């Protein structure tokens, strides 16, 4: 398993690409979908899923780009569904609204396990505080 950290966008959001056996999961694709897409392509990786730790603008910016590129699954906690559905997160500093058109699979448990890369399990722990759906 390989974990690669990318620092993306004007907010310098940490994005993680976790890969194993030519499959990948992206955690918090904040911006610059082209950079993430190039990394996937250059390493011959198939994006299986995007996992969002919360729905703030600076963590979801490349969701649609990557979904349109790969048709991967997207996971987020249901606590942030309203945030992402209403205006899909607003960048208050730039007065922009980011709309997400990709389908998001919301989960609601405080502790959830996902087997995404066949033999690797990802555990999500609900951590209310930063947003209503922080994990």
Language model region names:
Residues 32-120:
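Active-site HxH/HxHxD metal-binding segment of metal-dependent hydrolases
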Residues 1-45, 101-135:
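Catalytic core of the metallo-beta-lactamase
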